[in-house]
């Protein structure tokens, strides 16, 4: 049985751990709020670009952008968004499990995959399983910049525009609320004109504002479509990173709260054991004193 001194040492260690996890929980709360603001701020831009591109495409049905064409190549691109750090529960595990299942399905269908890793955890995992990583970006910090994302992602976008890959998928964790995040594996390319138009109409219905799109575009509508669709895809990737960061801090906050609560429970149990050990020691000493006094009296 552990001595009182050993138990006191364990209690002290767990109290130190509890302070650390509590501090990390509070930091995650602050970072999560900022990440949520950044995530919400990015949505209107992507929506507006999509609306303009969708209506331009509807007005010019004869023009089909490279991102809307269907390629027959036996190669698929995949953008995997994970975190740079751990201690966020099963967030990365769930995303990487989804990616692994997709890669397995592609292999069964006789197709290969080229991946782009955003985040250190995904980059390390993809290398370990032998996936082909054509580009990556890590250490984005708490404020991701689009400029750092464009280069790695452009590798797949250019390959799709050249017809070298048949589709591009995007995998990340979508932020629902503080307690719930969902893994998303969605097709990024080819873009669907019908889907973009449906989302535009839904957005306009929700906002109650119908727009007139009788504009004059310079130098011409096709050049504007080319630029807007690239910006739209980049905005979707940025939005996924912002969603993933909000999910990361929410998951870390929950994980650290659970760790703090568990540390508190262990401390309570150790204090109970310590008190019982101390009580047993005191009882033993009293018994020895009483026995000694009885022996002297006899």
Swiss-Prot record:
PROSITE patterns: ATPASE_GAMMA. It is a peripheral membrane protein. CDD domains: F1-ATPase_gamma (cd12151). GO terms for cellular component: plasma membrane; proton-transporting ATP synthase complex. Produces ATP from ADP in the presence of a proton gradient across the membrane. The gamma chain is believed to be important in regulating ATPase activity and the flow of protons through the CF(0) complex. NCBIfam families: ATPsyn_F1gamma (TIGR01146), PRK05621.1-1 (NF004144). F-type ATPases have 2 components, CF(1) - the catalytic core - and CF(0) - the membrane proton channel. CF(1) has five subunits: alpha(3), beta(3), gamma(1), delta(1), epsilon(1). CF(0) has three main subunits: a, b and c. Belongs to the ATPase gamma chain family. This is ATP synthase gamma chain. It comes from Albidiferax ferrireducens (strain ATCC BAA-621 / DSM 15236 / T118). The gene is atpG.
């Amino acid at each position: 049985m552990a001595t009182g001194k050993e138990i006191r040492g364990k209690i002290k260690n767990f109290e130190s751990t509890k302070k650390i996890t509590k501090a990390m929980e509070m930091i995650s709360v602050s970072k999560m709020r900022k990440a949520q603001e950044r995530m919400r701020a990015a949505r209107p831009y992507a929506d507006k670009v999509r609306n303009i591109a969708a209506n331009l495409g509807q007005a010019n049905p004869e023009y089909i952008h490279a991102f809307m064409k269907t390629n027959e190549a036996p190669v698929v691109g995949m953008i995997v968004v994970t975190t740079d750090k751990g201690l966020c529960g099963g967030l990365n595990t769930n995303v990487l499990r989804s990616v692994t299942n997709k890669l397995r399905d592609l292999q069964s269908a006789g197709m290969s995959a080229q991946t782009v890793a955003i985040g250190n955890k995904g980059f390390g995992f993809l290398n370990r399983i032998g996936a082909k990583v054509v580009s990556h970006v890590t250490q984005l910090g708490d404020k991701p910049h689009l400029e750092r994302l464009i280069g790695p992602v452009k590798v797949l976008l250019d390959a799709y525009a050249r017809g070298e890959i048949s589709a591009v998928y995007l995998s990340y964790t979508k932020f629902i609320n503080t307690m719930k995040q969902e893994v998303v594996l969605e097709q990024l390319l080819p873009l669907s004109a019908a889907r973009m138009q449906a989302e535009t109409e839904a957005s306009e219905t929700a906002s109650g504002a119908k727009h007139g799109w009788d504009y004059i575009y310079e130098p011409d509508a096709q050049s504007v479509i080319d630029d807007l669709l690239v910006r739209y895809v980049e905005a979707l990737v940025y939005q996924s990173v912002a969603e993933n960061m909000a999910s990361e801090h929410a998951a870390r906050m929950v994980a650290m709260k659970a760790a703090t609560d568990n540390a508190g429970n262990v401390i309570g149990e150790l204090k109970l054991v310590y008190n019982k050990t101390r009580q047993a020691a005191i009882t033993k000493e009293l018994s020895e004193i009483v026995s000694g006094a009885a022996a002297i009296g006899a």
